[in-house]
Amino acid sequence: MRIPMTTKHIYIDWDGPYTLDELEELDDPRIDYGLYQVLMTFRVGGTLVLEDSFAFPAMMLQRIGTEKVTGFPGVPTVFAMLLQMDLSQHDLSSLRYLTNTAASLPPTHIQELRRKFPHVTIFSMYGLTETKRTLYLPPEWLDRKPGSVGVAIPGTEAWIEDDAGHRLESGQTGELVVRGRHVMRGYWEAPEATAARFRPGPIPGERLCYTGDLFRMDADGCFYFVGRKDDIIKSRGEKVAPKEVEHVLHALPGVREAAVVGVPDPILGEAVRAFVVTADPALTERQILAHCRAHLADYMMPRDVVLRRELPRTPSGKVDKKALRGGEAAPADE
């Protein structure tokens, strides 16, 4: 990828929460979220505590106390695991803030994080490699904007368009478009992919990024992630946003993680399939479907539920839905 040098300056100058003493780094520095933790630490003169992985969360939590870590950047998978742990055995009093990216946190997870970390400021953000961090929710808005990833960071303009290129008003769903000096210049030696993702802006030489992500915006200008355009499920002639079904699943006590995909169905066109990781081994597929039936329209109902010990991940920590779709038979874990 070709990324302008101004990108790092915009993100660093914004600072966000990074007035820090010590930052714990779980993210691969070869991925943008991890790389910017390194740059931020240099910018503010902090200390970076490196972790190999989240395979041993108790050791990581112990190191937070030992090193007096003040900032913890994570992704939804990591926070879902933290919410299932007894944190009272660890000294986390030094933590001042948590940041989340890769995918939006379910509102129920944010509520639980607030309960388990009452003294910590939580930043819910959205970004992609092509534009880096793009949206953030001011922490003081968490209670009144549940599920939102906020507004554009300074120096960024963001809006929503329909397939015809018209800007949409609040309450409507469309593709997020991003404008700013931090939008990357293109994919290395891939002109067709570059042309599909980027279009000319109003200033000569400027590029707009068409993210491929569906959002809606409320009357206050706050953005809500709906899903990837290519993740939308077309079932019974209706469009189903997986994120809406996933939020319902996450609201069921005992569900640690959930991912929803569409699978071919000869009658429905596509059927909704839910993959669920449970924290409660007694939770059954039947109970999960009953919960969905009570909270979802018929066309959004999962045809089946597959229980998993864990969900496949991309290198950036997102759920790998392509891998989930690939397992057509999708047998449950033993």
Show the residue positions of the predicted features.
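Active-site neighborhood of HAD-like aspartate-dependent phosphohydrolases
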Residues: 3, 7-8, 12-26
